[in-house]
Design a protein with these regions (language model features):
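Sec-dependent N-terminal signal peptides
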Residues: 4-13
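Short glycine/proline- and aromatic-enriched beta-strand/turn motifs that initiate or cap beta-hairpins
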Residues: 16-70, 212-218
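Residues that define the transmembrane beta-barrel architecture of outer-membrane proteins
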Residues: 23-29, 50-58, 103-109, 159-165, ...
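Transmembrane beta-strands of outer-membrane beta-barrel proteins
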Residues: 27-33, 74-80, 109-111, 124-130, ...
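Transmembrane beta-strands of outer-membrane beta-barrel pores
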Residues: 33-41, 64, 82-88, 105-108, ...
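Flexible, solvent-exposed loop segments that connect beta-strands
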Residues: 39-51, 84-106, 138-159, 190-200
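Outer-membrane beta-barrel architecture
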Residues: 59-65, 110-116, 168, 208-210
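Predominantly the C-terminal beta-signal and adjacent terminal strand-loop region
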Residues: 83, 154-218
């Protein structure tokens, strides 16, 4: 709840919104949730690198106004799609020659509060905000050499919270159906494997389709 209050206060100060308009601001903020998988691979002579891998994702978003006292979920979007990308390497200070090449999978549950960006009225909409990702689970898949078993569970100490910026763009195809494009830009080292000498943050691009459910009487 504190995070919600801080985010609303930040938007209010940024856009110079008065107290009278504070209620309208709350109605405009969207609560977003998403499940996705990030990847990082150890490569020969390179500390870590991203792979061009696609993974399915699914999510749910609703405006805060839909969670009112009347309990009417009047604007809920169900989102399905896939994400492209994964971890972006950084802070690699030396070259390491790996005898075993491995791929790390980390599954995240992302949530975010987003605010609509000022665009002309039309079929195109855009929102942005901060997201928080909690690691659900992770595993190591050997690519070549070393391991006998196909997958190894990743230790919880390697599963770091993911925090970053979210940009979402929608294009309305119908009153209930929209095309979605999302960009997640991690700000922290959500993957930290100091034993092998590298850290990484999330960089994810996703596309998909959203369906709007509404129980509001026309």
């Amino acid at each position: 709840m504190k995070a919600v209050i801080l985010y609303i206060s930040f938007i209010s100060i940024t856009f110079g919104i008065s107290r009278k308009d504070f209620g309208n601001l709350v109605k405009s903020i969207t609560l977003y949730g998403n499940i996705n998988t990030s990847y990082v691979v150890t490569d020969s002579y390179i500390g870590a690198d991203t792979e061009n891998i696609s993974s399915y994702s699914y999510g749910l978003e609703t405006q805060l106004s839909s969670l009112g006292l009347k309990g009417r979920y009047n604007k809920i979007y169900l989102n399905l799609g896939y994400s492209q990308g994964g971890f972006f390497q950084r802070n690699i200070h030396e070259t390491i020659n790996y005898e075993v090449q491995k791929r790390y999978h980390i599954h995240y549950a992302h949530s975010a509060l987003t605010y609509p960006l000022p665009l002309p009225k039309g079929k195109l909409q855009s929102t942005s905000g901060l997201y928080f990702g909690l690691p659900i689970s992770g595993n190591i898949e050997p690519v070549k050499g070393g391991f006998n078993q196909p997958e190894i569970e990743l230790k919880k100490s390697y599963l770091k919270t993911d925090i970053g910026l979210l940009l979402m763009i929608k294009y309305k195809l119908h009153s209930s159906i929209s095309l979605l494009s999302t960009v997640k830009y991690g700000l922290n080292n959500s993957f930290d494997y100091t034993y092998e000498g590298y850290k990484a943050s999330n960089r994810i691009i996703g596309i998909g389709i959203g369906y709007r459910y509404s129980d509001r009487k026309k």
